[in-house]
Amino acid sequence: MLKLLLGDPNTRKLKRYQPIVEEINLLEEEVSILTDDELRNETHNLKSKVSLEINIKRQNEKLEEILPKAFAIVREASKRVLEMRHFDVQLIGGMVLHEGQIAEMKTGEGKTLVATLPCYLNALTGKGVHVVTVNDYLARRDAEWMGQVHRFLGLSVGLIQQDMSPAERKKNYACDITYATNSELGFDYLRDNMATEIEEVVQRKFNYCVIDEVDSILIDEARTPLIISGQIERPQEKYQKAAELALSLIKAKELSKDGIDPEGDYEVDEKQRSCILTDQGFAKCEESLKVNDLYDPQDPWAHYITNALKAKELFVKDVNYIIKKDEAVIVDEFTGRVMPGRRWSDGQHQAIEAKEGLKIQPETQTLASITYQNFFLLYPGLAGMTGTAKTEEVEFEKTYKLESTVVPTNQVRKRQDWADQVFKTEIGKWKAVANETAEIHRNGRPVLVGTTSVEKSELLSSLLFEQQIPHNLLNAKPENVEREAEIVAQAGRSGAVTIATNMAGRGTDIILGGNSDYMARLKLKETLMPLLVKPDNEHKPPIPQQRSSKAGGGFASKSESISNKNSKSSGASLFPCQLGEDTTRKLSLLSNELVKSWGERTLTILELDDRIATAAEKAPTEDKLIQSLRDALSDVKNEYEKVLVHEEENVRKAGGLHVIGTERHESRRVDNQLRGRAGRQGDLGSTRFFLSLEDNLLRIFGGDRVANLMNAFRVDEDMPIESGMLTRSLESAQKKVETYYYDIRKQVFEYDEVMNNQRKAVYNERLRVLKGSDLKKQVLGYGDRTMEEIVEAYINPDLPPEEWDIEQLISKVKEFIYLLNNLKSTDVSVLSVEELKNYLQEQLRIAYDLKEAQIEQFRPGLMREAERFFILQQIDNLWREHLQSMDSLRESVGLRGYGQKDPLIEYKNEGYDMFLEMMTNMRRNVIYSMFMFQPQSEKETKS
């Protein structure tokens, strides 16, 4: 009713932007007549205007004022550099982002290009802008691709990658616009707050941030906190023994009901992802280990056995992790990518290593942690883009105070979403997927099949291999990851078949007919790699797979490509045509020229990639070699384009890209993202989901209703089932999962918010120390508080002075400050409580000046160094212990719900008391350490 009366709020919002769009369009002609240098000069002028405003409110008002001009400049630069002009709807998207909202834009509507508008505008403040993507590959691609616009306009562009040194990171964070992944930003923030020198801090103060695929980062990954940990020693034989024992234990067929254990040694709750020993299992373990109690604090076993059971039942090889170079490497469940260097905590990773017979790495202890929710809330300006925000609108608003606005599409969507096909068994489903893939492939249409794990992608790959369907595999296995750009470049070609794990989060458009720009880059890389790249670097990435001569298109199967790896023609048929004689000769001359200038086999793969990427830009360059490389790229691209334009036409006529989903995801949003890969920018396309009653989602969350349905349907495994009741069960299962995970995220956020206030206080204190301004004043402040606390602990103001325990008080003060050894009870016996505090604080200051004079005799400046060292040492040690205590508290407060107490309130109250105690201990320890500090000369140290 309200909607009818007031109209759609989204439409009202969009109307508000229309006059500004018209103003930008009017400026287009004025800006288009400027030369490149004049356009760059406009950046300088706008920067000057914004920097004149010191007040943040006035600065924001100035940004609003110059927005039309800034957007018009970016649009013009993009036309010149990328040959891409921002549509009106993209200008609206830019305004939505600038206002700190989430812009929902469908796949293929140019989200990446939209981000250039608010990034340029907010970079004019000189405070830095962060563009956040889900993986290193996309961060690099966007920095190279969209970074051209910013560099052309005179802004500096930085890129953060996983293997960068601190010095490189610092340099890149200092740029006007920095592209990075969410995890790199988060870990750098935590590392900065563990730095011992201000020079080690790599990040600047946060200003404005745009998150690409915002739902993936702020919602899917919000359940898992970022943790930096240090090693602690635990007996390795316990992990091995527990893994052996877990194999001998028998899983119960059902869960316990009404407190009655089922038959078996342990039960598995897949929904809660937990394993629990039954009474029978406890007895069996205690007998096998010859112990009386698995929870004995002197010899604990329960934790090891539970982890071993979880490793056996819930952590599946090639789904949750892969084995790479004798290590268990985590696979990100949302992006399907490996996460080298990341480990599961609480001994879970060690349990998996024991299960797989790998070398067991030492266990770790948390040194610093933060959730993505609290991390991104540190940015004063936060915005995001996604193809699917409306499904999670409530969560964005409640947790992040972010509004969502749906930006209209530039062209009408022509995609067809075909009805789901549901099968009784998984085997039946996979056969049907293989058959539909084969049929669409033979019609000359490209097919993208989304799978949920490495294991499933390889199962489908083997089924297609049996049918002799050439295809490409894109999953977390290293040999496939390295070929990502190449696989995606070809995925839209006629008859191409691509199997991808969790393609939804990959953020790469599939261009019908193939991507001539990427193919030209790959051709150059293939030509130059044997001549310029160091031999030990040569294997990465492998030579591109060849096009298959069988079937009407597609690509060679894995086995074919391996057998051809060393043949000279290996890469030839990957590309749409053989290059003409003229272009081939030019490439040969260029290769010789580059070898002379850059040296034979002296570059790394990354360096060669960088140079080809720079050549692919249109920004002006004075480097003649880069210019020659640019000309060669242009020639190759033009030749490929002539062929691909016909291929694109054929693919369009055949019906465009067909997307197949092989399992419903936990969230409807991720299913919609996968569908969105087809039918970009008004292209034709189609999608279909194939499901089975044995799929995880239905099995875990579908309940008894689905189990009964399985028995009710007496149909063959390869016969699709259609039933209204089944469709409703599916939707209800998905809603159940979404609600379940939302509750988990909400709980993670509420508990971490308690930690967040404490974290901010500790990190602010650390930063003050690192900056080193007035360390003496800070330590004396600690001393004043300590003296007050000692007086309050030993003196009861309600008692008469003659009953005060002055002797004990004096003794305690001397414990902290040995230089006050001459202090006597008679000196203070006539003082009131306030006078006593003031007197002791005065004495502490005199003693501290005396101590400083002693220390400074050794070396001038040593006292300040000691102050910094002891404060940081105490903060870090006590914070680490505090994190452990808070973890233990969180585990234990859950049980208080049984006593009618709210666990969260209990956690807040006790956590606050523990934090106050930690800060008190920190102050006291610093004072004690400073007075006990006795520097040694080098002679003393050597002796």
UniProtKB/Swiss-Prot annotation:
Its main location: membrane. Signal peptide: none annotated. ATP binds at Q90, G108, E109, G110, K111, T112, D509. Keywords: ATP-binding, Cell inner membrane, Cell membrane, Cytoplasm, Membrane, Nucleotide-binding, Protein transport, Thylakoid, Translocase, Translocation, Transport. Part of the Sec protein translocase complex. Interacts with the SecYEG preprotein conducting channel. Has a central role in coupling the hydrolysis of ATP to the transfer of proteins into and across the cell membrane, serving as an ATP-driven molecular motor driving the stepwise translocation of polypeptide chains across the membrane. Probably participates in protein translocation into and across both the cytoplasmic and thylakoid membranes in cyanobacterial cells. Its EC number is 7.4.2.8. Disulfide bonds: none annotated. NCBIfam families: secA. PROSITE patterns: SECA (PS01312), SECA_MOTOR_DEAD (PS51196). The gene is secA. Residues 556-570 have a biased composition (Low complexity). Belongs to the SecA family. The keyword Nuclease does not apply. It is a peripheral membrane protein. PANTHER family: CHLOROPLAST PROTEIN-TRANSPORTING ATPASE, SECA INNER MEMBRANE COMPONENT OF SEC PROTEIN SECRETION SYSTEM. Residues 534-576 are annotated as: Disordered. GO terms for biological process: intracellular protein transmembrane transport; protein import; protein targeting; protein transport by the Sec complex. GO terms for cellular component: cell envelope Sec protein transport complex; cytosol; plasma membrane-derived thylakoid membrane. It catalyses: ATP + H2O + cellular proteinSide 1 = ADP + phosphate + cellular proteinSide 2. GO terms for molecular function: ATP binding; protein-exporting ATPase activity. This is Protein translocase subunit SecA.
